[in-house]
Amino acid sequence: LNPKTVANYRKSFVDMDKTDPLDAFVIADFARCGRITSSPWRGAQFLALQRLTRHRLHLVECITREKAYMVSNIYLKFSELAVLDKGDKPFSNTYGATSAAVLTDFLSLDDITYAPIENLVAFVKEKGKNRFSNPHETARILQKAARDSYRLDKVLYEPLNVAIASSFNVIKAMEVEVKAIDKAIVKTIKGLNTAEYQSLASIPGIGPVLASGILAEIGTIISFGSNDALAKYAGLTWRVNQSGDYTSDDTKMTKTGNRYLRYYLVEAANSVKNHLPEYKDYYYKKYGEVTTHQLKRALALTARKLIRLIFGLLTKNQIYSSDKVGEIQ
């Protein structure tokens, strides 16, 4: 029962009140028209796997949300660090160990600005475990960013430090939980060890977690008559916007399907493009076709292309190979 389709069906009734009995009537009438389809039972094992893969997505979304929230506090304390271009940033990862140490160990920006460069270099080396190729340059960029940042009243620095440190602790704790869930997912899927899992795991870039996330939502491929049906179920389809001789180039993704499946397919596409030249070329081709929404558009279209491969392998019970496809015995 899709709430969106029922809500749209309700609009066909003119001048109807919004009450519980009338809601039940609309749902019953919707079912009478034969528009409700039941999902096939996939077994308790797939349901257990689905609980794990969906909980993993929940944790990932919590981490993303916490990072987005923490950026506001980072901007207040160290404004220039938050707005620097990717190539100009002193650290490749704003949420990494060295960045966390800089944001929490130094109470104010003046502590960085007026610190001897030698002490700052030693600090970067220690917190970065000697992994920086040019720690002196990193310290120089860090000091310049501190000089260029806005200054706050001194009473604000301590609360900001506490808030930022708390966010780092929350993120670290949730990342530990994600790793624990990953281990549980691998253990569960290896207990199933289905032919479908072998097919997906044979694709370069798709590991046990991504394969499990996809299979937990698909269940069995016989539920889908074509790769188009699978794409529609994942919500990786685009509506045509056309009138007369005009056809809009800006078409929005429907996103009306299974958002969990869509997430794991997009993540799989992002990983596969780093392992298979064919998908890498396709990604950058789509990336260069437009000037807006480049990354999201290219990734979504690459995921749609990956669906054709996944559907083909699962329906034919085959494993992936760069030169030939072999059948699973």
Predicted features, each with a name:
Residues L1-Q329:
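A detector of single, family-specific signature residues
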